[in-house]
Swiss-Prot record:
One of the primary rRNA binding proteins, it binds specifically to the 5'-end of 16S ribosomal RNA. GO terms for molecular function: rRNA binding; structural constituent of ribosome. One of its GO terms (biological process) is translation. This is Small ribosomal subunit protein uS17. Belongs to the universal ribosomal protein uS17 family. It comes from the Bacteria. GO terms for cellular component: cytosolic small ribosomal subunit. The lineage of its organism: Bacteria, Pseudomonadati, Pseudomonadota, Gammaproteobacteria, Alteromonadales. It comes from Shewanella baltica (strain OS155 / ATCC BAA-1091). Keywords: Ribonucleoprotein, Ribosomal protein, RNA-binding, rRNA-binding. InterPro entries: NA-bd_OB-fold (IPR012340), Ribosomal_uS17 (IPR000266), Ribosomal_uS17_bact/chlr (IPR019984), Ribosomal_uS17_CS (IPR019979). Disulfide bonds: none annotated. Part of the 30S ribosomal subunit. The keyword Transport does not apply.
Length: 82
């Protein structure tokens, strides 16, 4: 197992839960036949201890131990406000 901690940047799509946010991570994938780059989105639940995020914020998150059934990421910082 590698010692490198995974960090990602994404946009907050929901902050309706207490101390939790939903972050959309966008990546580009090359189509196997046509070669065109397509946008793909992954939604991740992350822990926001102080409830400081709002919808549309650009945030940095890092992987951590499982905090619940779906949460295993935590908020590092708010890169830019919406």
């Amino acid at each position: 197992m590698s010692d490198k901690i995974r960090t990602l940047q994404g946009r907050v799509t929901s902050n309706k839960m207490d101390k939790s946010i939903t972050v959309a991570i966008e990546r580009q994938v090359k189509h196997p036949i046509y070669g065109k780059y397509i946008k793909r989105t992954t939604k991740i639940h992350a822990h926001d201890e102080t409830n400081q995020c709002n919808e549309g914020d650009l945030v940095a998150i890092r992987e951590c131990r499982p905090l619940s059934k779906t949460k295993s990421w935590t908020l590092v910082e708010v890169v830019s406000k919406a």
